[in-house]
């Protein structure tokens, strides 16, 4: 199990990123728009750099919902490979069957 503080920090990043994603996308669009003047683009770059670091989606780490494990994460199930195998073997995940051929 991951430390609770690490999991909570990641959840905080998810919330901040969701709240500021539209503003961040708008600023990036202004920065990449070459039809605007250099001063406008530079002002947008300064605003973007003043935004919180945690508002960037790059800083979010996919973690298992049950254990908080950051590695071996399956996006479809939102859990780690270990928990997926445990719950799948006892039939707790609908539609998941053990493969045999």
Swiss-Prot record:
GO CC aspect terms: cytoplasm; small ribosomal subunit
Keywords from UniProt, A to Z, are: Ribonucleoprotein, Ribosomal protein, RNA-binding, rRNA-binding
**Alphabetical list of Pfam families matching this protein:** Ribosomal_S14
Q: Which PROSITE patterns match?
A: RIBOSOMAL_S14 (PS00527)
Q: What does this protein do?
A: Binds 16S rRNA, required for the assembly of 30S particles and may also be responsible for determining the conformation of the 16S rRNA at the A site.
This protein's assembly is summarised as: Part of the 30S ribosomal subunit. Contacts proteins S3 and S10.
Q: What is this protein called?
A: Small ribosomal subunit protein uS14
| Gene transcribed to yield this protein | rpsN
């Amino acid at each position: 199990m991951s430390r609770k503080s690490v999991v909570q920090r990641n959840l905080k990043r998810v919330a901040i990123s969701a709240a500021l994603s539209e503003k961040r996308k708008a600023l990036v669009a202004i920065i990449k728009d070459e039809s605007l003047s250099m001063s406008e683009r530079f002002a947008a770059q300064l605003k973007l750099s003043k935004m919180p670091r945690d508002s960037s989606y790059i800083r979010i780490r996919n973690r298992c919902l049950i254990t908080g494990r950051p590695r071996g994460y399956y996006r479809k199930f939102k859990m780690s490979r270990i928990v997926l195998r445990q719950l799948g073997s006892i039939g707790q995940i609908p539609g998941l069957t053990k493969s045999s051929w």
